[in-house]
Swiss-Prot record:
Its EC number is 3.6.4.13. Residues 202-217 have a biased composition (Low complexity). Belongs to the DEAD box helicase family. DDX23/PRP28 subfamily. Residues 805-816 have a biased composition (Gly residues). It comes from Sclerotinia sclerotiorum (strain ATCC 18683 / 1980 / Ss-1). The lineage of its organism: Eukaryota, Fungi, Dikarya, Ascomycota, Pezizomycotina. GO terms for biological process: mRNA splicing, via spliceosome. Residues 410-613 form the Helicase ATP-binding domain. This is Pre-mRNA-splicing ATP-dependent RNA helicase prp28.
Amino acid sequence: MASNGYLNSIDAVPPPLIDSDGRPPSPPPPPPDSFVPPPPPSSLAPPPPPSSDLPPPPPSELQPPPPEPKKKKGWGAPKPGPLSIEDILKKKKEADEAAAKPKFLSKAAREKLALEKRAKEVEEQRRKRESEQDNRIPVGTVNGNGYGAANGRDGYERSHQQDNARRDSSFVPTGPRAMRNGQQNRPSSDKPNDMEPPPKSAKPATTAAGSSKASVAGEKRPANAEDLQAALIRTRYMGAETNQSTFSAKKKRRRTTEKKFNFEWNAEEDTSPDYNPIYQNRAEAGLYGRGRLAGFAEDEAATLKYAKALEERDIEAGSARAREIVEMERRRKEDAGRNSLDKHWSEKKLEHMRERDWRIFKEDFNISTKGGAIPNPMRSWSESKLPKRLLDVINQVGYDEPSAVQRAAIPIALQARDLIGVAVTGSGKTAAFLLPLLVYISELPPLNEFTKNDGPYAIILAPTRELAQQIEVEAKKFATPLGFTCVSIVGGHSLEEQSYNLRNGAEIIIATPGRLVDCIERRVLVLGQCCYIIMDEADRMIDLGFEESVNKILDALPVSNEKPDTDDAEDAQAMSRHLGGKDRYRQTMMYTATMPPAVEKIAKKYLRRPAIVTIGNIGEAVETVEQRVEFVAGEDKRKKRLNEILASGEFQPPIIVFVNIKRNCDAVARDIKHMGFTSVTLHGSKTQEQREAALASVRSGATNVLVATDLAGRGIDVPDVSLVVNFNMATNIESYTHRIGRTGRAGKSGVAITFLGNEDADTMYDLKQMLMKSSISRVPEELRKHEAAQQKSQRGQGLKKIEEGGFGGKGGAGGC
């Protein structure tokens, strides 16, 4: 029948094979057709046989295979031969291919597999629970020790039964007794392979390694009544455990194996206090008196109310007391506004400035002062103590805001104090000493027919002719509107011409040291009433060998009005008094960029208790100048590179090119003309008329490029210089600083390009340090790694000490 055929197809499953060692062989790999669903489990009942009315199924290729012949068992069964490597590889390949193919399972099949898996898990848990119950020995029946069962027979039988049960089941061996956490007391006759596994943890471990570590560390399962009773008995007979470590391996494992950081937070992590009405509602403490806290009223209404109550209570003295209360409240409000820290110094009035505000003000302008009784700097021209007519002249000239050195030096100079100003080049030093000078001589009697022959009231010394003439031009802007006369005495002009200019007398004389000494020795000029001396670029004068000339000039001054070297020299009122109704104490000012020992010696000899004003850092370049250094070897390559820079159109004229040798000036200027640019030269071999004409052509814009030596490196002010090119690197870092200071003046920006070669090794270290200090400059890699830039050169140190000591000099390049 069809039904019998269907049943035979189900029951025709071959019996499991048995290996020679009695174990069933490994199951065969899955069929290649992975889309065929797995056979139903044996636990499910087979479907009912089809009715006899239906025709038998047609024969097809899917008919079940015929039953295999039964194999012989026992000693007569043929022994299976060893598998060949080809068969093993073939089976493995087929298994891998079958596992790699996707298997389609319907929803019903997936549910059936899940039910089977769940049923197996439940059966496994039930079997383990029964095994644990069978293996557990009740407390008090420990066998073989005389305090359990009546004799050791019970323990032996139980152990024998457990051994038989374990051989029949898949038993997992356990570790030694010390690792079982005292769960039960086993008989001493148990073998190592009879120990049961440790109980499962209530909380499953994340990994197998973590589970094993937790078991070894002694993770305890949930305690029950039997475990507690066993623990009490163990404590009673064996004593309490001592020196028990509180180290938690679980916590350590969680801390060290935590690799994923959780960026979220839970509500349990919130440690802020909950809502508390005590902290939400602030208590207002009403105190005695007219106000609340500390007895002060919070508003004006309460103060007025209190004052009115005083008047009503005491008719005679109450009104006076009420007025005092109101006035005290007004002063308190003013003090609160004056002492407020939220306002910048620029928003406060002068009388509201505190010491903290002045400290911030000095830091903003990089001002540092040294000396006693130094006044605060001025914030603007209107807050200075300059006379009204001089302020009008300043406004006409176009000085909107004072520079840093003017803010600090002018208030000190107006107190008749001796002053040493250390400032970078291009910082406005000329106006810083000219304005106090004009205020000083305006208080002296004007020159007449008799007093004009006694000499000037003030002299200004400059190291070079160009700087002296530049100071003269600047001084005439302020002195001429006030009615004062300024005359310059420099070399290059005839002595008769300068004597003619002095025929009507002059309040201010600007001169170079060499020519001024000639005039004094030839009796062209006397200093009988000179009481104001200014030395500009004092360090440069010493370098040029004018120390002896400076000493002669200062020794020729009258000594009747010399300041005392006492504390009175710091008293502004005492130093402002007139001596004998006409003369005043002599006032000496010195401005320099560096302070070599020779300059310090002059200052100590001729200045009395001077105030020292420093702007910026000594010897550093202006922060507005971008310094670029290029390694270019050879004259031809440098000329080619100079042509590229000038032809780029990046820099607008005027442009200054510095060289070290006079004969190179004319050669470089000639090459620049061949490039298509106009150029003039400036060096010591030029006559005074040629120097003045060259500077005038550059300042007027008629000439594009000025080629000069270090003669034009200091004090020469050519407005709007956009580029300075050091065709040859300066011989020392001080000259380099003054060279690049020709650009970036008056707060404007500029660029300085320096051509460097191996012959400049003596200055590489200082140049690298200067570039590193600049925030807008970059040190080239070749200079950073150069051997000469790693340490300061020691060459020429002895000669430098002799020059600084005043025993020699470099000659009078800019002298008379």
